[in-house]
Amino acid sequence: MASYFPHGATNSHASMRSPSPAASPLSPPPQRSNALSNRLTSVLSASYADSDIRDALETLSLRGIHNTAETRRQLRLDVQKEVVDSNAEIVRDFGTVAEQLQRIGAVISSLNQTCEEMRQHIFLAKQDTTPVLEEASALVSQKQESETKQQLLDAFAKHFIIPEEELPVLTSLEEPIDDHFFNVLARVKQVHHDCEVLLEGENQRLGLELMEKSSRTLNSAYQKLFRWIQKEFQSLNLEDPRISSSIRRALRVLAERPSLFHSCLDFFAEARDYALSDAFHYALTDAVSGTGGDRSVKPIEFSAHDPLRYVGDMLAWVHSSTVSEREALEALFVADGDEIAKGIQAGLSSEPWSRIDEEEEVSFDGQKALSDLVNRDLIGVSRSLRQRVELVIQGHDDPVSCYKIVHLFLFYRATFSKLLGPQSNLTELMETLEKFAFTRFERIMREQVTVLSSDHSALTPPEDLSAPEFFLDALEALTSLMKTHDASLGTEDADRAPAAENQFTPVLRAAFDPYLELARSSATELQDATARAMYTTNILLTARSTISAFPFASATHLPPISTALSDLRTDLLGIQHRYLLDASGLGLLLTALEPFSPSTTTTITTTKPKPDTNPEDTDTDTTLPTKKPPPNIAAIATLPAFQPDALIATSQQLDDFLPSALMDATENLKRLQSATFVKSVTEEAVEAFCRDFEFVEGMIIGADEAAGRVDIARVDGDGDNEAEIHEGEELKLEQEMGLRRLFPRTTGEIRVLLS
């Protein structure tokens, strides 16, 4: 922005500070110069930071005034002139406003006068119309009260009063049971319920009269409904999937009267019992005699010769009928949810006199009631079924078929328990028949065992010592029983507790244990202990192979069989070991070396012969645990069994035995039915034989070594006695030959030949 002061102002200002020249005659007087100087000084001393000066300068700059001498001289005048012009214009504007305000005041005065006149007219009109309005208001209030009373009267009559023309729908037997009947009945029930409100007031007469009238109407309606349902039940076809909805609705309504409802159910159960009994009899005997039936369906009685099929067909029919009956009754009583249960619950609450215990909690179980109704419907069928089943079981002697029938009852007991509950008649009937059939099964098994025990020919062991025929037949029957049990339900308990008794344990006690004991007792017919052991082993091996495939059978009976087999195996091992010792001749050497055995050097056994017996056969009377000094091992050469001739004969017998030893040992137990069992017993017997031979070999070597040391010492110590010297030379000659040279076989050779 251009400066308000010209460029030369500074110089002039500076010149003012310089010493003034000499006064001219034309110069102004000194006072004026001082005033101007003071003025300039005050102007120049003003700070540019002053906001007023800054605003003034900005305003001056906005006016676009040029900083000239003329402008500076006229500035004040121009500004004052502008102020005067502005004030004059404002005065003119205020004059115009004053004129307009005067006109507005005149208009307001005119309006006030007009309003006052109107107020006077209104006041006069109000005075004239007030009585008329008061009278009209009173009339309107009276009209509203009359209308309200009329509405209340209409509502009361509509709600509490049943038209006379609708009452015959509930009471007349000629009127049908349809939707109109149920609608009117529902309305009467609502009126009867709402009458309780009328009884809460001071004047109870109207409420009592209406409640009495509605009660009579309801009783008549429920009686009519009860008779109609009984009539419908007589012609009701439960096999028809399209059961009338009206009868289901009638049952729901009748449930509000528990006494009538239960009477109706009793009538229904009696009718269904008769119908199902007749249908069962028809299925048993007259299935093909009907005119419209399926000619391919034969009566159940046609299979009476086969007890299992006969009983199974009857149970299948009963199960099918039970399922159909329950489904039909569910469609009849439970298809609409728990409406009947709610109705019975409400009826029980409204009939406290029907409770046995006044403090008993009122409750109704719809599913239990349905199962009870099905049970009642099948009472006649259950009675007929029980009679026929008991006759069939009593007249049949096949234990396998009898046990299969037991499992049929077991299966259907679980089925009926799920269908009708564990306390239902059919479930209890299945349990009763199951016990009856199993009792018959046990009786049959006992009779068979009794017959076998008196048959000597059947108890005679076979020539090949195999299991007897009657025992094989019993195991075959037992296999059928176990397969039946394994394929049926209810065997999970054996898997959970394999060491405990299970459902099949009583069967084993009846069909297995007696035959096993009878077979084992027949072994007493054999005089030979080896044959007796092999015969008993064959019996137990056959029994074990039969039951081991079934965990529920092996859980309880395999351990005792295994224990008995272990004992027999020990006996057969001793027999086989003795056979090897006797056939090889090693037994004679072991018998001669018994005094040198470590087990005989610690005790002294005193024996005496039995009376009237061979002195060699002795019984041990006492065993004294006294210390016995070990005999001199060199004395073995003096034993009879170790004399050269006897020892050479024994060695020759051993050589003759070894080539066919295994075959001969196996042949000794050839009548055992298990080759694996024979092999294991023979291998252990061979191992025991090798240990015995090793003992004999060690004793022979020890005797040779001991004899050499003793004989040399005896010759050197007694040289003066010629007889003793001569005897020593003979013994030395025998020593040079040695027992080992007479019995050259080694343990290694024996193991190789017997491997």
UniProtKB/Swiss-Prot annotation:
Residue ranges with Low complexity bias: 12-25
Localization per Swiss-Prot or TrEMBL: Golgi apparatus membrane
Region (Disordered) residue spans: 1-35, 600-630
InterPro entries from the UniProt entry: COG6, COG6_C, COG6_N
GO cellular component: Golgi membrane; Golgi transport complex
Main location: Golgi
GO BP, sorted A to Z: intra-Golgi vesicle-mediated transport; protein transport
Keywords in alphabetical order: Golgi apparatus, Membrane, Protein transport, Transport
Domain of life assignment: Eukaryota
Residue spans crossing the bilayer: none
Record-linked PANTHER family: COMPONENT OF OLIGOMERIC GOLGI COMPLEX 6 (PTHR21506), CONSERVED OLIGOMERIC GOLGI COMPLEX SUBUNIT 6 (PTHR21506:SF0)
Family recorded in the similarity comment: Belongs to the COG6 family.
Free-text function comment from the UniProt entry: Acts as a component of the peripheral membrane COG complex that is involved in intra-Golgi protein trafficking. COG is located at the cis-Golgi, and regulates tethering of retrograde intra-Golgi vesicles and possibly a number of other membrane trafficking events.
Name of the molecule in the record: Conserved oligomeric Golgi complex subunit 6
